[in-house]
Amino acid sequence: MGQMYLQRFAYRDRVHKAELDQAWAEAFKTFAKTGNWGGVEKGVTHHQTYGTGWGGLVLIEVEDPDAFGHYQAYHNKTYGHVVQVTWEPLFDMDREFEETIRNSR
């Protein structure tokens, strides 16, 4: 299993609807072609996208750091004018603290 990341995208203020629609159109084409929002053929696996009123969250798994670099650059180049994107590495807190919780009984 690779490193899991939570990707957050938030719509920028004062973005025109036409710009946002154009970015989404490109995003849908990218996803249809590669199975992820970052346009990489392998090395980044998309698990789920969640929408919110301010943008959304994407759960991805990274197996190849170079592919992740391309994934990030694609976002900055293609969507950066309409959304602010951040990536946070995740760890399994349930597994990490399982013994501590068990010993707290």
Where on the chain are the PLM-derived regions?
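Short, intrinsically disordered, mixed-charge
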Residues: 73-77
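Short, structurally constrained coil/turn elements
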Residues: 36-38, 78-81
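Short S/T/G/P-rich N-terminal loop/turn motif that feeds into the first structured element of a domain
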Residues: 1-55, 62-71, 90-105
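Conserved short beta-strand edge segments in small beta-sheet-based binding/regulatory domains
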Residues: 79-93
